[in-house]
Amino acid sequence: MTTLASDHPVSLPDDLPGWLRRDLRSDHAGESGAVEIYRGILAVSGSQDVRAFAREHLRTESRHLRLMDALVPPEQRSRLTWLWRLAGWVTGALPALFGPRAVFRTIEAVETFVDGHYAEQLTALANA
């Protein structure tokens, strides 16, 4: 069992089905990329509003990543995590070059995708 900084124990059974392990691996990669989106924004944006938004969301996504780190053992994580991190950073930095509107539109698109992805996973869990 792993304990997070918030002292909430986290453990998963050893007999999780393969599809659920794959979903968790995907979610871990996604959270890794999400952290980098906000780091990319912070590296490029000069807008104080955008930077405040990015700092707040970076804290949230960092908590999510810590949870996923606790749930998914290193040997079960995607071998392409480095690529998802790079893609995340570029996904944040590139729109930040074009200003706040581009940043917020990009985040809206990413979050819309993520909401759909998690909805599919919840449906799969409900039907398992």
Give the ranges of each region predicted by the language model.
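Non-heme di-metal
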Residues: 1-128
